């Protein structure tokens, strides 16, 4: 019994050590309200990319990159980010909202081929966003942390039952999710 316990503890210590090493190797990316999408992705997407959707596509491109890299950290610097559609967050991702960040839901895209969506963030790999039934039980996105280093706001910009109604964060079949230090504003109807 003691030997099995020692092996179990040792295995857990090795797993923790490997996990810490992997986390340390994951890259950190930083964006501002003026940032362009990663490596220009989406900038030539006619009918989608414009001055209204620029911030959405900038954040989206980095979340897609983090999915491909197996995780990492996205630091969002001070400013207002207008989000017309859902941003999908993959596993092993940390999003740090710096002091003074506002994530504001908008319901206009000014894009011919892109309609606004009803949410802001969803814990789902971007590559699986259009697929149905990809998760069940607790096998969804995991190990996600969204936090603020000061005062950060997610503004759902509720406009009444006949106007805009938005879901700030959709979580289904997820585990190890941490949300800290963020003010959720203007959620008068609907869900968190």
Placement of each model-derived feature along the sequence:
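Juxtamembrane cytosolic interface motif at the C-terminal end of transmembrane helices
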Residues: 12-16
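Extracellular/periplasmic carbohydrate-active domains that bind, remodel
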Residues: 3-6, 17, 24-192
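Active-site-proximal or metal-binding-adjacent scaffold patches in catalytic folds
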Residues: 9
């Amino acid at each position: 019994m003691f030997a099995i316990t020692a092996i179990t503890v040792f295995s857990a210590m090795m797993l923790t050590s490997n996990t810490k090493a992997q986390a340390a190797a994951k890259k950190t990316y930083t964006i501002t309200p003026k940032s362009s999408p990663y490596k220009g992705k989406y900038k030539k997407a006619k009918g989608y990319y414009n001055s209204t959707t620029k911030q959405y596509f900038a954040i989206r491109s980095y979340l897609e990159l983090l999915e491909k890299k197996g995780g990492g950290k996205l630091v969002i610097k001070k400013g207002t980010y207008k989000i017309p559609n859902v941003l999908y967050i993959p596993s092993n991702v940390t999003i740090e909202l710096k002091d003074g960040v506002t994530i504001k839901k908008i319901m206009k895209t000014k894009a011919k081929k892109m309609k606004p969506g009803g949410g802001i963030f969803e814990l789902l790999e971007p590559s699986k966003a259009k697929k149905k039934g990809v998760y069940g039980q607790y096998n969804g996105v995991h190990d996600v942390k969204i936090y603020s280093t000061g005062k950060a706001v997610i503004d759902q910009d509720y406009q009444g039952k006949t106007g805009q109604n938005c879901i700030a964060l959709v979580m289904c079949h997820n585990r190890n999710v941490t949300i800290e230090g963020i003010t959720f504003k203007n959620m008068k109807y609907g869900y968190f």
